[in-house]
Amino acid sequence: MPIHEIRHPLIRHKLGLMRRADISTKSFRELAQEVGALLTYEATKDLPLENYRIEGWCGPVEVEKIAGKKITVVPILRAGIGMLDGVLRLIPNAKVSVVGLSRDEETLVAHTYVEKLVGEIDQRLALIVDPMLATGGSMAATVDMLKKAGCKEIRALVLVAAPEGIRLLERTHPDVTIYTAAIDQRLNENGYIIPGLGDAGDKVFGTKQKPS
């Protein structure tokens, strides 16, 4: 399974700011969008192009455009919403599918409560966005949904990934490409990534954070 840890200086700098224990909701939200945009740049570098002609200021000119590639962005609720605006800033015409998953805090198993996929999913490149790839359960479940609906090309954009989550995706969906700002050390006994970012959903929405 291809996994790309994007070690661009801007990403490393912004991720370092996000790791601060005292970061404000506003700052975390803005940085999540910015890193999401930078990951989108990396995840779309190989999209095919085609030539076409336009009328320029000095006459006809040949330019390029993305070759008819339909894209859907798939935020995993609720934390994935924190990255969505950053992704759409670069691909504003992309359709948005929504998947809602909640994790049982004892078993760490993900349960689906929302599944709203756009039409023609079988013809689209799906970009799943979720700040944390921890156990990998939510990501694997989302990929399952997309494949069941006919989606054939899936990429995942995450801020931080744990080795445990990567291994699960390698076993269950080796054809999915992952783009991450960092591969961290491990999960703790509660399923939180170490050193991680804390609870990304709580930090995006400003709700009370659970102890890790």
Curated annotation (Swiss-Prot):
Regulation of protein activity: Allosterically activated by GTP.
UniProt lineage: Bacteria, Pseudomonadati, Pseudomonadota, Gammaproteobacteria, Pseudomonadales
SUPFAM superfamilies found in the cross-reference section: PRTase-like
Binding residue positions for 5-phospho-alpha-D-ribose 1-diphosphate: 78, 103, 130-138, 199
Native species: Azotobacter vinelandii (strain DJ / ATCC BAA-1303)
Keyword Hydrolase: no
GO function terms (MF aspect): GTP binding; magnesium ion binding; uracil phosphoribosyltransferase activity
InterPro entries: PRibTrfase_dom, PRTase-like, Upp_B, UPRTase/APRTase, Ura_phspho_trans
Family statement drawn from the similarity comment of this UniProt entry: Belongs to the UPRTase family.
Name of the protein in question: Uracil phosphoribosyltransferase
List of residues binding uracil: 193, 198-200
EC number: 2.4.2.9
